[in-house]
C-alpha cells in the first residue's frame, strides 16, 4: 500500500488506541527507539506525547545504548516522566513480560541500500550480524512468538515497515500471528495492526 502521508506505523497504532476510552494507566511498549530525527520517524516522541495526554506509560526498548540515551533526551525535551528506556534486544525483553496493552514493533532493519555505514557498523558491533531481510524477518518472528499468548481483549500489536507479503519487516511474523488468533485490522502507513480474535 502506498504511503503518501509521511506517517509511519506509530500513527496507525495511535488511531486504534484512541478507540479505547479507558487509557489511563495503560502501557505502550515500543521496540526500536528514536535514532535519527527524520520527518515522521520519531515514534518515541510521538508516543510520549500520546502517553502524556492520556496518563499512559511508555517503555522504549532498543539494542543500542545510543538510542536509549536518545529516549532520555526526548523525555527531557517533552518534560515526560512516565517512561522506561531499556537497552536490550526486543526478543529478550519481550520474554520477560507477562502481558501487554499496546506493542509497537519497529526493530531489526530490513535490507535496503540507503542504510548509513554507522548503522551497519552498529549491527556488527552490538549484534555481531548484518542487516539482511532474513535477519529482520527472524527478529520480528521471534518477537511475536514471545508475545502472541500475552495479549488481552483490547491489546493491539503493530508492525511497522510492512510493504507487502514479500517486502518489509513482517514477512514471517504476520503469517504466524494470523495462524495464532490474531486478526489484521488495517494495513496503512506501511504498517499492519492486529488484535486478538475471540
What are these model-predicted stretches?
Residues 1-198:
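A short alpha-helical cap/connector motif
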